[in-house]
Amino acid sequence: MSEQEVTYSMVRFHKSAGLQKQVRPEETKGPREAGYRRCSFHWKFIVIALGIFCFLLLVAVSVLAIKIFQYDQQKNCEEFLNHHNNCSNMQSDINLKDEMLKNKSIECDLLESLNRDQNRLYNKTKTVLDSLQHTGRGDKVYWFCYGMKCYYFVMDRKTWSGCKQACQSSSLSLLKIDDEDELKFLQLVVPSDSCWVGLSYDNKKKDWAWIDNRPSKLALNTGKYNIRDGGCMLLSKTRLDNGNCDQVFICICGKRLDKFPH
């Protein structure tokens, strides 16, 4: 075969309009994936932030609940202690009042018993004697002993100095009242008239003094006695009062039992 002509031809297929409009997936995949990643990052940040917020809120609520519980517990404890203290104080007051009432009841019983004994002893031992046995004169005396002391009531009226001499002539002295109990006892047994006792005003000392110049446990408000009314003391059923020493009244002499000769 001699020279032959080789003819080349190029075949070109034209794409249809539909195929031309199709976009390769690879061409759109990059932008979509980038947008999705950005959106996913934002949501993760929000979720983490919400989680932290919820955790902090839970912690705050827990702390608040604990504080409220502790406050309630402390308040209840304080109320209980206050109530307990109040109950203890009330019980102490009740016990104290019961003890005071018991003591007062005992004192009342003792006073009633003492009063009965005093009246019984006075009615039993009061005797009228002829004072010639004691003074060598015709004075009448009531006498009795009670406790550690004997009492002589010289019924013939005398001045305070006369009573002092009458008592001394019988180896006695005008009565010194030792305390409030003795005063109350004597007011039960003295005659209806007032009686001289051994208390007088000492012009040198400018004060009232007992006949033995010794103090007494009897508390006297001597400031109420006006010396102008008299400087000698009288005993009646109701009170001690001062009077004119030159007036005449019954005498009360006294002597302790341990002072009598054996």
Curated annotation (Swiss-Prot):
Q: Which cysteines are joined by disulfide bonds?
A: C145-C150, C163-C251, C167-C253, C232-C245
InterPro entries hit by this protein? C-type_lectin-like, C-type_lectin-like/link_sf, CTDL_fold, Ly49_N, Mouse_KLRs, NKR-like_CTLD
Q: Where is this motif: Cell attachment site?
A: 137-139
- Cytoplasmic side residue ranges read 1-44
Q: Indicate where this protein resides in the cell.
A: Membrane
Membrane-traversing stretches: 45-66
Q: Which PROSITE patterns match?
A: C_TYPE_LECTIN_2 (PS50041)
User: What are the GO BP annotations of this UniProt entry?
Assistant: cell adhesion
Q: How does it sit in the membrane?
A: Single-pass type II membrane protein
Q: Which residues form the C-type lectin domain?
A: 138-257
Where does the record say carbohydrate is attached? N86, N103, N123
Q: Is Disulfide bond there in the keyword field? A: yes
Tissue expression: High, in T-lymphoma lines, very low in normal lymphocytes.
Pfam families per UniProt: Lectin_C, Ly49
Any one GO MF annotation of this record: carbohydrate binding
Primary localization: membrane
GO CC annotation, single: external side of plasma membrane
Q: Which residues lie toward the Extracellular compartment?
A: 67-262
Q: Does the keyword Membrane apply?
A: yes
Keywords from the UniProt entry:
Cell adhesion, Disulfide bond, Glycoprotein, Lectin, Membrane, Receptor, Signal-anchor, Transmembrane, Transmembrane helix
Q: How does it assemble?
A: Homodimer; disulfide-linked.
Per the entry, what this protein does is: Receptor on natural killer (NK) cells for H-2d alleles. Inhibits the activity of NK cells thus preventing cell lysis.
Protein's recorded name: T-cell surface glycoprotein YE1/48
Q: What is the lineage of its organism?
A: Eukaryota, Metazoa, Chordata, Craniata, Vertebrata
